[in-house]
Structure formats: C-alpha cells, structure tokens
Amino acid sequence: MARRSRLRRLLLLLLLPVASTSDAEHRLFERLFEDYNEIIRPVANVSDPVIIQFEVSMSQLVKVDEVNQIMETNLWLKQIWNDYKLKWNPSDYDGAEFMRVPAEKIWKPDIVLYNNAVGDFQVDDKTKALLKYTGEVTWIPPAIFKSSCKIDVTYFPFDYQNCTMKFGSWSYDKAKIDLVLIGSSMNLKDYWESGEWAIIKAPGYKHDIKYNCCEEIYPDITYSLYIRRLPLFYTINLIIPCLLISFLTVLVFYLPSDCGEKVTLCISVLLSLTVFLLVITETIPSTSLVIPLIGEYLLFTMIFVTLSIVITVFVLNVHYRTPTTHTMPAWVKTIFLNLLPRVMFMTRPASNEGNTQRPRPFYSAELSNLNCFSRIESKVCKEGYPCQDGLCGYCHHRRAKISNFSANLTRSSSSESVDAVLSLSALSPEIKEAIQSVKYIAENMKAQNEAKEIQDDWKYVAMVIDRIFLWVFILVCILGTAGLFLQPLMTRDDA
C-alpha cells in the first residue's frame, strides 16, 4: 500500500507541469480569441496596410501538360504578417512564446494564384498557423496548383519553357495589403527532382499594377519558372529510331535493282515514319502556330522517303529497258556511260571481247577439212562406180576445186564465206542445209548479244543514277539532320 501511494504521488508530480502548461495554453487561447473577429484586418488604424511577407517554396514539379498547356506544381506558400490582437506576455502564461491555432480562427490574406487553370484559386485553410507572442503570424499552407503556361514547342524535345506564377490579393488593394518578397527567388531547398524537367532558375518579382476595372493599385508577386526538358526519353524512344529509319532510305539506292525489294523497302520506311508521327501528335500541343522540331524532322524525312520512292520507280524503269522499247540517245551514252562514272569513281568491268582472241572463222577451221570430207563423200564416182582410193579423174577434179575454194574463203567475211560455201556445187544438199542452219543460229546469237549489250548499258545507266542519288541523299540526310537539331544550340548561344 505504501508503495502504491508513493507511485501515485510521483505520477502527480510528473503530470503537474503538463497540466500547468495545458492550462496556460487554454487560458491564452481563451484570452486571444475572446473578442477576436477573423474578418477584420488586424490593424490599429484603418488606413494602415497589412504588410505580408511572402515566399513560395517548390516541393515538386508534378507535370507539364503540353497539350492543355498546364503546369502542375506542389508548393508551400509562406506568409508572415503581424496581428496586434494576438500579442501576449509569455511570463503570464508559463513562458509560452508560441502557439499553434487553426487557420480558420484568425484573419488571413486572401492571396490567390491569378493564372490558375484548374481547381481552386485559393489555398485550403485546414492547416494551423504559428502565433508568436510579439503578434507575428506565420502560415505555411501546402497547395497543388495547376497554372496555365504558354508552352513553346518550337524546339521540342530540346525546349526551354518559361512558366510564370502570379500571386496576389484578390480583394485588397495596396492600401489595404502590401506584399513584400522574401528573398529574390523561389525557395528550392526542399525541391524533389523531376525526371522530365530541370529547373534552371526561378526568380521572383514584385509588381504594382493598375487594372482597367479599378482605380486602385494592386500588388502581386510573380515567379518566373525557367525549366528545361530532359530529352533523354525522347532521344532514345523517338529521335534515334527516326534517325535509323531515315538512314535506311539511303540504303534503298545501294540495293540492287534485280532484287525486286527497292520499292518495298521505301514503302516500309514511309509507313514506319507515319506511325511515329501519330505517336508524336499525342505528346505535343495541338497548336498551329509553330511546328515542333521533331515534327519538322519527321516531315523532312517523309518528304525524303517519298522522293526516294519516286526516284526508285524511275530507276527501275531505266533498269528494265530493252532495245525493243527504248532507244538510248547519244547524250545518255556520253553522260551516263562515260562522264559520270569517272566523277563517281565507278569502274565498269572490261568486256570479254577485248580480253579474248576473236574465234577463227568457220571457213578457216571447219571448212578446211572439206578435202577430207570430200574424200569420204567421193568414194562413189559420178558414174556410180566405187573409187579406188580417190584416184579417178572425177574425184581428183572435185578435190582440187574444193581445196582452191577453201583457200579463198580465208580472205572473205563469214557471211560471204557461208554463201560461197553454199554455192559450191560439190556439196551435197544435206550439207548445204546444215550450213544454212548454222548461219541462222549465228545471226540470231549475234542479235541476242547486241540486245544484251544494250540492256547491260541501260542497267549500268540505272546503276549510275542510283549511285548519284546515294551520295545526294547521304549529304541531304546528314546536313538536314544536323541543321535541324543544331538549331536549339545556336539559338541558346545567341540568347
């Protein structure tokens, strides 16, 4: 029992200061708000303004909506003013120098975000305010604002944006409330880094503006938020694939025409770029004022690919030309077979005709054996009796005639030689018919060779055109890409 009694006394001694402090705060609260009116400005003289010290702390840049041109931020609005009705002597209340009270119990300035786009213009007053015995009131309510911001997508995704946030009293003019900026810029000490945007700077400015509606002057504090987009996401997922696809267009002119896939490759590249363009349109603002940089590049690449399709169709038309459908002009031979190949460092393989000896004429090779052939055939004489080793007069006369004629054939042309051979009365009708067939085959093969040479010339002309546009498209692709994506850097240096 004695032990329990001692414990009770000890607990009473420990709780006595707490009860005393709680009682002091209760008495202080009752005294401060006994006759307090939260609607009346806390000034002793009605002509005196309430000086509001104002500062914005950025907690998080939640999102920048380019389509709707809205910037969503999480801010802390620090507001400090003096309320002469909320002063007390700490010694009368157990040394209490600070007191936290609900914000709806005290007078607060009606500071709103002027350029608010969605949601409430004013912050919620459910947080508590800190009171100091000197009458100083500190209120730091958190708020999520969706402010309107004019997004300039000219250099998207390498763009910089300047979004302003204008704070001020909605109903009190400068004679009633005057704003004083704490510091020279937005407080970023507690800022949570964004994965898409980097804040370059956020200076603050105070303005005293006279609006058309009223004669009074209204003060405001405006923060200019300079932000830079982090382009890594768009570079990896949009720009690099577009670059690779656009460079595939160059390979169209290196692809041989005989493979039959040149037009297919062009159309596949065009369809891929169309899909990328549909993706881009969902991420940029729906505005007709400017075309974003990535949109310009896609448009440039689509024109690039469309021209490659037109040129490829023309090249295929040239490639498959034949002597029966087209005649090659002399200027085409001069320019595309002689001049341009040297300029483009193209070397055409030498013809086989210059590297091999001309085959012996038919008459010098095979007709030289007519003597042997005549000996075999002349085993039967004209009279129908067998010849004894070709010693009869008729066979001797026939052999001599063929030998003399074969000697003369070596000095004449092939067609003339064949005609001369056919004129020999010594040859049998079967031999003449065989030689006539050989003559027809030779002339047909000669015509086919000439036609093939002309077709090869047309194919070489198509190859030269392909090589020209290969280098042209490489230069245009490199220069166009560099010219477009270096614009943000050049503009930034000029600024």
Curated annotation (Swiss-Prot):
* Predominant localisation class: membrane
PTM summary from the entry reads: Ubiquitinated; by STUB1/CHIP and thereafter degraded by the 26S proteosome complex.
What GO molecular-function term can you cite, just one? acetylcholine receptor activity
| GO terms under cellular component | acetylcholine-gated channel complex; endoplasmic reticulum; Golgi apparatus; neuron projection; plasma membrane; postsynaptic membrane; synapse
| Disulfide cysteine pairs (residue numbers) | C149-C163, C213-C214
- Would the keyword DNA damage be found if you checked this record's keyword annotation? no
For this chain's UniProt record, which GO biological process terms are given? acetylcholine receptor signaling pathway; behavioral response to nicotine; membrane depolarization; monoatomic ion transmembrane transport; nervous system development; neuromuscular synaptic transmission; response to nicotine; signal transduction
PTM sites of type Phosphoserine: S403, S406
> Quick check: keyword Cell membrane in the entry?
yes
So what family is this one in? Belongs to the ligand-gated ion channel (TC 1.A.9) family. Acetylcholine receptor (TC 1.A.9.1) subfamily. Alpha-3/CHRNA3 sub-subfamily.
> Subunit structure, per the record?
Neuronal AChR is composed of two different types of subunits: alpha and beta. CHRNA3/Alpha-3 subunit can be combined to CHRNB2/beta-2 or CHRNB4/beta-4 to give rise to functional receptors. Part of a complex composed of STUB1/CHIP, VCP/p97, CHRNA3, and UBXN2A that modulates the ubiquitination and endoplasmic reticulum-associated degradation (ERAD) of CHRNA3. Within the complex UBXN2A acts as a scaffold protein required for the interaction of CHRNA3 with VCP/p97, this interaction also inhibits CHRNA3 ubiquitination by STUB1/CHIP and subsequently ERAD.
Q: What is this protein called?
A: Neuronal acetylcholine receptor subunit alpha-3
Native source organism of the sequence: Bos taurus
